[in-house]
Each structure stands twice: as structure tokens, then as C-alpha cells.
Amino acid sequence: MSTKDWAEKDYYKILGVSKDAKPEEIKKAFRKIARDNHPDSHPGDKAAEARFKEASEANDVLSNAKKRKEYDQARSLFGSAGGFRFPRGGAQTSVNVEDFLRTASNGDGFGDLFGNLFGASGGRRTASRSPRRGADVEGETTISFDDAVSGTTVTMDMVSQAPCQACRGTGARAGTVPRVCSTCQGSGMHASSAGGVFEMTEPCPDCHGRGMIVEDPCQVCHGSGRAKSTKSMQTRIPAGVEDGQRIRIKGKGSPGENGGKAGDLYVKVTVRPHEIFGRDGHNLTVTVPVTFPEATLGAEVEVPTLAGTTVRLRIPAGTPNGRTFRVRGRGVPRSDGSRGDLLATVEIAVPESLDDDARHVVERLRDSLPQATPRPWEVK
């Protein structure tokens, strides 16, 4: 792709973001497009593959502050003006190219702008293949409620793109090797001129910037040099993780290319519910059934903890149904080493059936209590 073609592509439009979009907005937009169009999810869908590649190209430029600045500068020269041209014919015009380019590039000057964009600031140079960061990988795991509170290590089988083992990343069939591109002599770059005035370098159209041409492609990766790789890995789930939370593990995604860093692993955690306890942030919740006499007269009851022990909880006389008591320090661990609390909510247990003696006792209690109704809407 020539520099002019590169500048004329609207990467902002491809990702669906504004020209002043923040890095996190660009990252979010690219992830959505990549997730919806990833070749692994749409095998054989050329349109989805094209959208994925186009979005990857746009993200590669816009997510890099230096490349984004150069791209915006190139757009101001080529994209918005329909191409950079000197006047031809008619009156001779004296143009100070250094001043013009310094103005167009916000003061960076001829050497900085064209040196960065075209790979040279005076004369031709050979460009090496730049490192590329590996793709991020998504994974899922399901753990118990107890493990979510205390933290655990899980074994996960992850599928990612890695150098093809069959061809060792060359893209060529086993027993063969790629040949050096005769067009660029292995540099991966091709010289072209802009109106006979400037000489620029751009990715070689024959080898697409690789410097090598695969004539007999690998049957596993079909010449790409990359293939699906499944590996088993130990993943640490931190204490206090919540149901549905995504955990980022740096450097555990797909391997990079040409010495680039590996991508990240994002693990979505599903937590199985507990029979007794619930969660409210860093607090644990538990329902404590009490009898009517206990709630009315007061009592001390034992309340379970997630550690398997119990604590004594004092129920004051006249405790209403639904009142919550706080047991400090018996909740979920925080990152600073402290813990949340245990929230114990009283639930008055009503017997489903009574024998005659018990019924008479309740009736006598009813008759001895004040006749005022507890329902405010019935008060006259």
C-alpha cells in the first residue's frame, strides 16, 4: 500500500469513532469489530475476514500515538486535499517546500514528517519488518462460591494464534523455504516517486512487506505462518472476584510476530451460587431464621461463617422481621488486606401447623395483646 493510499483510508470511519476519540474508545470499538468478525468465528466468510483485517489495520495505526500523529499529518496533506501536487504549467511559482511541509506538519518539518511516513529523510533505506503485538484471547471459567471469596488457581485450555509448528512460522511446506523477493531484494520495501519530485518507500506489492515469497505454501497454515494453538495453562483467580467479572492477565494471549509482545488473556469468571451465603460487594449475606418467642423476648443464636465456624449473635427483644445485623470482619477479602462484613438478616419462622395446646397458647397471647393494628392503612 502506498503512503497516499494509506493516508486516504479513513481509519476513524472504519472503527466508527470520531477523529478526537480517546485511546480507550478506539480500543473498545476495535474489540467489538474483532469479536463480531474474527475468522475463527466465521470460517470461510471472506467478508468478515476482510472487515477483521481492515479493523486490525486501523487499530494498529490509531492505537499507536506516534503512528496516529503521522497518519493525521498525512491525511492533511493527501487525504483532504485530494493528493499533494505542485503546480504545473502557467506562471512559475516559487515554493519553499521546507516551509510548506513544516506548516502542514505542525512544525515537525520535512525530515521528521517524511522520514517517519516514508522511511527516509533523504535517500532510500531498507526497512525491517516491525514487531507486531499478539492478539488478545478470551476465556471462561466457573468456580465455587468459596473459591471466589478466597481465590484459587484453575487450569484452562486456551486456543490462540501462534507460529505454525509444521513450517516453523515460515509459511512454506516442510522441506522447502521461501525465496527472497526479487522485486525488493528481501527488504520488504519498494521505492516509488511522487510526481518525480520525492522518492518514497512503501511495502513491496509482490511480497506484501515480508521480503520473502512462499511458492509452495504449508498445508497446515496455507502460507500464513500462523496456526491455531491449544495450550493448557495455570491461571490465578484473585480473592474477592465477583460473578461475571473479567480478569486481565498480561502477556498470556497470542504470541507476537517479529519479536512483538504477546497479547493479553481476558478470563470471564462465573461463580456458582452458595446454599447459605450471598454476596453484596465485599460483604457476605446470610438469612438467620428465629422463632417468634426469640424475636419477641430476645435471644442469642449461632450464625454460620464461610470459614465453617459460627459466631454468637444477640437478638434484642422486639426484633422485627427483616432487621439486619452486622458482624464485622467476616466478609470478603479486599486488596488492602482488610475484609468486608457478614450481614445477618433476621427471618421470623412461622410454624406451619400447631397442636391444640400450642394453638390455645397463641390465642391467649393474641387476646392479651393490645388490639391496635400494625397495618397503618387500617387505622381509622
Swiss-Prot record:
J domain segment(s): 10-75
Positions bound to Zn(2+) 1: 164, 167, 218, 221
ZnF locations on chain (CR-type): 151-230
GO MF, any single term: ATP binding
Biological processes per GO annotation: chaperone cofactor-dependent protein refolding; DNA replication; protein refolding; response to heat
Cofactor note: Binds 2 Zn(2+) ions per monomer.
Biological function: Participates actively in the response to hyperosmotic and heat shock by preventing the aggregation of stress-denatured proteins and by disaggregating proteins, also in an autonomous, DnaK-independent fashion. Unfolded proteins bind initially to DnaJ; upon interaction with the DnaJ-bound protein, DnaK hydrolyzes its bound ATP, resulting in the formation of a stable complex. GrpE releases ADP from DnaK; ATP binding to DnaK triggers the release of the substrate protein, thus completing the reaction cycle.
Family: Belongs to the DnaJ family.
Subunit structure, as described in the record: Homodimer.
Domain notes: The J domain is necessary and sufficient to stimulate DnaK ATPase activity. Zinc center 1 plays an important role in the autonomous, DnaK-independent chaperone activity of DnaJ. Zinc center 2 is essential for interaction with DnaK and for DnaJ activity.
Protein name: Chaperone protein DnaJ 2
Taxonomic path: Bacteria, Bacillati, Actinomycetota, Actinomycetes, Propionibacteriales
